[in-house]
Amino acid sequence: MCLIALAWRALPDYSLIVAANRDEYFGRPAAPAGFWDDHRNVLAGRDLEAGGTWLGITLDGRFAALTNYRNPSDRKTGVPSRGGLVSDFLTGRSGPLEYLQDVERRAPSYNGFSLLVGDSDALYFISNRGAGAPVRVEPGIHGLSNHLLDTPWPKVEKAKARFAERFKKTFDAASAFELLSDSQRAQSGELPSTGVSLEMEERLSAIRILAVGGYGTRCSTALCFGKDGRIEFHERSYREDGSVSGTVSYRLTLSRERGRASSRRAGSRPPRTPLPAR
């Protein structure tokens, strides 16, 4: 992922709402979001090159998402894929804090990353380019791009502000996708300096990156965890020319027994109205 906006325990009827864009080279093979054959409680896209993922959930209410930390000068070769940090949490049994304490020990062996993991009880953040220790995420609206949580880059600040405007009471997938489709670039004077050229900084400053040189926004994801046990998960995938290549939508209902849930795929379009809150 390269942009994540989220509301954690900030709305009365939802524990978590997420709107996220994944930016990647279009030549890197990936599968769209779906339930994994080898881990049937995991709903996520999949990197077909390394086997991990960038964002996903489980039927017992776990959530994880990752962004790369942008600093080209310290990139190493021959290191583990960062997508495994997401998939390992989703397929494992460790709690969020316990898992990130283990990640902290292994973090130096990876290229730069920022990672969010959580369940119904808590949400935590860690980066191997920050303080290094897991941090409990406080209730509120947060944003993450290719740096630390809530670093005030223009795209992060814009996404957080628009997120707050759109999700005051209820979740709506169409509003999330509208937010994630903004391809306007920031002004040059507002740009961070992350070790790439000014031209590249400008390109990367948009919420949705239109493809140039085979790189851009590959998919958008909108999801919510309702406090009544309901989940919505929607993903929209893009071709290199910017057109939509496909959408998937799921409505999930968690049972009271941990680890079990019923699910229904909602079709190729996100629902036009949100699920009713109880």
Whereabouts are the PLM-identified features?
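N-terminal nucleophile
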Residues: 1-260, 264-265, 270, 274-278
